[in-house]
Amino acid sequence: MNWVNKSVPQEFILLVFSDQPWLEIPPFVMFLFSYILTIFGNLTIILVSHVDFKLHTPMYFFLSNLSLLDLCYTTSTVPQMLVNICNTRKVISYGGCVAQLFIFLALGSTECLLLAVMCFDRFVAICRPLHYSIIMHQRLCFQLAAASWISGFSNSVLQSTWTLKMPLCGHKEVDHFFCEVPALLKLSCVDTTANEAELFFISVLFLLIPVTLILISYAFIVQAVLRIQSAEGQRKAFGTCGSHLIVVSLFYGTAISMYLQPPSPSSKDRGKMVSLFCGIIAPMLNPLIYTLRNKEVKEAFKRLVAKSLLNQEIRNMQMISFAKDTVLTYLTNFSASCPIFVITIENYCNLPQRKFP
């Protein structure tokens, strides 16, 4: 038991951060800027999808789930990275590392399945348009989203448990930006072949199978779009599917290169850069891709801004009216004792003069 306790460090040292302060400024600014854009973009999509009645459709329900994923995905890593860049000691506690590992795995696995679900939604909308409302009913949408979340978190529980059970024998230097399965397996002092095989199998299950189904679905989608007679209909269909296809390419491309490529001398540094792109850059780009290419989202955002400005103007008018009524009430009550003063105020405000007893 003592050997097991000694094998678990109290904290991990992250080696990828530089000790030179002048080298830390560019990544700090880049990570902070990306994080702010990610927060703003994904919160905007969630808010617009929830508030605007025209966006209460399966497509935007799944899109808001994706935005929530990206929001949490980035929040699980970037704040700790910003803290480490600013501090002299580049460390993360054991509990923080466990939480980061679990959340990163859970949200990444969920996104793998959710992107496939979103592709199924587009397949039904384009290839079965007359049956779309019957097939993609509200209950099925909730079931598909719940299945994605539950499967992702279940996979994270298994992988995190298997990874953290490996004895570290006092090793605590993580050559990565954050806690991730491949980086933690390298700290183990025993053979990790079984864990690497398990990781490869899970990667095939959550990456290759969904992306294969997505490619097959898009083959049918392209055939259906080409059969559309109107150019406007084709352009709208390709625009909607194009945004999703770009997001799919970014996510699955980086994830497959990170988990399924054979090891090579340059694979370690490439894996760190790919993880950085997948965990920070991709969540920032997803809202931009969907909003810039989606006319409905842009119009809904404009309606939301216009509604907010109108509500603010109404509140200002109500405050002015309330202040005016308050002043007039006070003047009315005050008129008996100071009629000359009230007449002067009413003349100044262009109010109708009243007769005093």
Swiss-Prot record:
UniProt topological domain (Extracellular) ranges: 1-25, 80-100, 159-195, 260-272
Subcellular location: Cell membrane
Example GO BP: detection of chemical stimulus involved in sensory perception of smell
Main function: Odorant receptor.
Disulphide bond pairs: C97-C189
Entry-linked InterPro entries: GPCR_Rhodpsn (IPR000276), GPCR_Rhodpsn_7TM (IPR017452), Olfact_rcpt (IPR000725)
Membrane topology, record value: Multi-pass membrane protein
Name this polypeptide is given: Olfactory receptor 2B2
Stretches assigned to the Cytoplasmic side: 50-57, 121-139, 220-236, 293-357
Superkingdom of source: Eukaryota
GO molecular function: G protein-coupled receptor activity; olfactory receptor activity
Main location: membrane
Annotated keywords: Cell membrane, Disulfide bond, G-protein coupled receptor, Glycoprotein, Membrane, Olfaction, Receptor, Sensory transduction, Transducer, Transmembrane, Transmembrane helix
TM regions (residue ranges): 26-49, 58-79, 101-120, 140-158, 196-219, 237-259, 273-292
Gene3D superfamilies xref list: Rhodopsin 7-helix transmembrane proteins (1.20.1070.10)
Glycosylation: residue positions: N5
Family designation: Belongs to the G-protein coupled receptor 1 family.
Gene Ontology CC: one annotated term: plasma membrane
